[in-house]
Regions:
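N-terminal beta-strand motif that seeds the catalytic metal site of vicinal oxygen chelate
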Residues: 1-14, 118-151, 155-159
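Short, structured interface segments
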Residues: 103-125
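Basic, Lys/Arg-rich alpha-helical nucleic-acid-recognition elements, primarily the DNA-binding modules
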Residues: 1-51, 55, 62-64, 71
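Short acidic/polar mixed-charge low-complexity motifs
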Residues: 43-44, 109, 178-179
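A short, sequence-level motif marking secondary-structure junctions
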Residues: 49-54, 117-119, 185-190, 218
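Vicinal oxygen chelate
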Residues: 13, 61-106, 140-218
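Conserved catalytic-core motifs of GNAT/GCN5-like acyltransferases
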Residues: 27-32, 115-116, 159-164
Length: 218
């Protein structure tokens, strides 16, 4: 699965553009009074204007799997990286064959840079925002994780991620290149104590040769 487009809400278009261009180094590809879009590798990442909603999301960017420490040092110069298990700041997902680190954006969204060692995506270029390969994960928050998982399977053919067994309150759908993270409402967003809540989200993704769209109301 590949996430081709991701649309989220923000209470501040201006501050969001400053963060994503200045800190992460993404290129702005379009902007209006009510939205701004960036190129995050092959994913088009769009923020649409909201008012006093304080929306918070959890999503991940894939980076070349030989650039984790370089990306860490590059981001650390610009913003604070979270501790996962103090004092460690790099998470090792052994079952996923991946490592990642986390930081907040200007909206309080929890962002993740993840290196997946099962993929062939190494790069010899110095790391910067143009090194980002895609948005590879987005969290969906629901009152009933199993029910949402079944709905997404029935409607879109999305199967459980082979490297992550199903849990009652946490199910991952997709493949190494694109994942939907289904979590129960009010569960802590890893690695924070931020309670997960649902906000409007739209995703355009490709799976098994078909391009589909999901819209989560809230």
């Amino acid at each position: 699965m590949n996430i081709l487009e991701l649309e989220l809400l923000t209470d501040s278009i201006t501050e969001t553009e400053l963060f994503y261009t200045g800190v992460i180094g993404l290129k702005t590809i379009s902007k209006t009074n009510s939205s701004v879009s960036f190129a995050a590798g092959y994913t088009k990442l769009t923020f649409r204007s909201s008012e006093n909603l304080k929306p918070v999301y959890h999503f991940a960017f894939d980076i070349p799997n030989n650039k984790l420490l370089e990306a860490f040092a590059w981001i650390e110069k610009k913003t604070e990286i979270m501790e996962v298990v103090p004092p460690e700041k790099i998470a090792d997902f052994y079952n996923w064959n991946a490592k990642s680190f986390y930081f907040y954006d200007n909206n309080g969204n929890i962002l993740e840079f993840i290196a997946r060692f099962s993929l062939d995506n190494a790069s010899e270029k110095p790391f910067d925002g143009l090194s980002i390969l895609s948005v590879s994960e987005i969290g969906f928050v629901t009152k009933n994780v199993s029910q949402l998982s079944d709905e997404l399977f029935n409607k879109y053919g999305l199967s459980v991620f082979s490297k992550q067994p199903k849990l009652e309150k946490f199910i991952v759908l997709g493949t190494d290149t694109g994942l939907f993270i289904l979590v129960e409402e009010n569960r802590d967003w890893y690695p924070t104590h931020q309670k997960a809540k649902s906000f409007w989200t739209k995703v355009v993704f490709s799976n098994n040769g078909k391009t589909r769209e999901i819209e989560i109301s809230d």
